[in-house]
Amino acid sequence: MGLFDKLKGFNETNTEAAKRLYDKATSEYKAKNYYSAVRLYEMAWDKDPDVGTFFFLSCCYYFEWGTSKDEKRCYELTRHAAIKDHPAAMNNLSFFLNTGYGCQEDRVEGRKWLERAANKNDVRACHTLAHNLHTEAKDDPKLL
């Protein structure tokens, strides 16, 4: 915001403020200033959760970077990022659903998210899906 904006009474919308906070949080995250990143991401989320995927914030809650571990919040943020088409979030959501991390266990839904992540060329999802298919084929030889 420049001097002219201040003089004319510039009013930032919630979405604009959220985007500014989100971008600053991402810079802090990449600089490994996790405590600051978490606070900025949460402020952005409160203003407008649709300004970004918030995938890095979910990582902070999972790994306890700049915050304490919070399985439910981590799941919520990961699901948000997956719905916004983030392949790594889709893979992580699959893991959470398959294990009940922060949510009710749902292996059928977990498999759907794993396949979606693999279709988006997420390498970890492709590997996990191949492993699962191999295991299923060993358990049911008719699949070979």
Short names for language-model regions:
Residues 24-27, 54-63, 92-99, 128-136:
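Hydrophobic face of amphipathic alpha-helices that form TPR/SEL1-like repeat modules
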Residues 16, 47-50, 63-65, 70, ...:
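Short helix-capping/linker turns of helical repeat alpha-solenoids
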Residues 3-20:
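TPR-adjacent "capping" and linker segments in tetratricopeptide-repeat scaffold/adaptor proteins
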Residues 16-46:
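Alpha-helical segment of the N-proximal tetratricopeptide repeat
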